[in-house]
Structures are given as C-alpha cells and as structure tokens.
C-alpha cells in the first residue's frame, strides 16, 4: 500500500506547483551566473559535495524547493539566505534553466 501511495503523493506534489510556462531560461542562466554557480556550477553539476546537482532536475521540483527555501518552509542556512532575494519570476527562470540542461547518465 505504501508503495502505491508514495508515487501518487510525489506526483500530487509536482502537479500542485504551477508550471513556469512563462519562464525565461536565458534570464535564469544569467541569475545562475551570479550566486548559484558558486555551489551548483553553471552546468548544474556541483563540485561541492554539500550542494546537489541541479542539471536536468524536474522544473516543478526546483521551483517548489526554491520557494520553500525563500519562505522558510525548508531549511538550509545558505539557501535560505540566497533564496530570500528571489522573486517568483527569478525562481521560475532558474528552475527552467537548470531543468533544461541535458544530462547523460551512464549506468555502472
């Protein structure tokens, strides 16, 4: 039963976040070139073991996470400080940019 609820719950969370239809990937790239790239890299592949890779991540997930960091509902000292300065448009643009980066996964 739990196996069926988890995917359904995950899908519900993703669908609850409005899509960033009007997001501007180029504006997101410019924003990422500022603070974001220091930890997450311009290519979304972090060199910092404390920071996750963002390349190819689901756009709605990224937008939800950034919104929660900004609003204090998700806690990380660095991210709460950085996200506090982001507007809804900034969040949509960053999420669209990092989600648009294609990643090749090579199985072991």
Predicted segments, located by residue:
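Positively charged n-region of N-terminal signal peptides that target proteins for export
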Residues: 1-5
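Bacterial N-terminal signal peptides
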Residues: 6-17
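Bacterial Sec-dependent signal peptides at the C-terminal "C-region" and cleavage site
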Residues: 17-23
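Residue-level hotspots at or immediately adjacent to binding/recognition sites across diverse folds
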Residues: 22, 42, 82, 97-99
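Sequence/structural segment immediately N-terminal to covalent heme-attachment motifs in c-type
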Residues: 23-43, 55-57, 106-108
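Gly/Gly-Pro-rich "capping" loops immediately C-terminal to redox-active cysteine motifs
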Residues: 29, 41-71, 80-85
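Conserved hydrophobic/aromatic "anchor" residues
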Residues: 32, 69, 97-98
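C-terminal capping alpha-helices of c-type cytochrome domains
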Residues: 60, 74, 84-108
């Amino acid at each position: 039963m739990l196996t069926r609820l988890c995917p359904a719950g995950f899908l519900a969370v993703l669908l609850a976040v409005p899509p960033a239809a009007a997001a501007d990937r180029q504006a997101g790239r410019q924003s990422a070139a500022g603070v974001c790239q220091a930890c997450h890299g311009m290519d979304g592949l972090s060199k910092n073991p404390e920071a996750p890779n963002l390349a190819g991540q689901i756009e709605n997930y990224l937008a939800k996470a950034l919104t929660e960091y900004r609003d204090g509902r998700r806690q990380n000292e660095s991210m709460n400080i950085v996200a506090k300065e982001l507007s809804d448009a900034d969040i949509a643009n960053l999420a669209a940019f990092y989600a648009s980066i294609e990643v090749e996964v090579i199985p072991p």
